[in-house]
Amino acid sequence: MEQTETPSADQLETFPNPRPERDFTIEIVCPEFTSVCPKTGQPDFGTITFRYTPGESCVELKALKLYLQRYRNKGIFYEAVTNQILDDFVAACKPRRCEVTSRWTPRGGITTNVTCVHEA
């Protein structure tokens, strides 16, 4: 099922953190991320990794998957998409800490990794 909506924080669902009194780290790896290079129109393929310490809520994984699929046909640079994903994740989940890293497949012999961090 192809998603055509623009990605936004309200598409991310959450559930209550089962241990809000404890700091713990959740790592989510999404190895099939795609977007479109706004300069060339070619598809970009990458892996998005979330490492976060939840506050009162945790992200629901199916909603996260559907949110990320909405970037499939969106023209956006690596740096912009990584920052936007972090901003939307923080708005939806309100984590104590969150790090989003995008690792992109090589293009022209160059590999790019982008890491964005939020500290509450």
Predicted segment positions?
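N-terminal intrinsically disordered, cationic/polar leader segments
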Residues: M1-A120
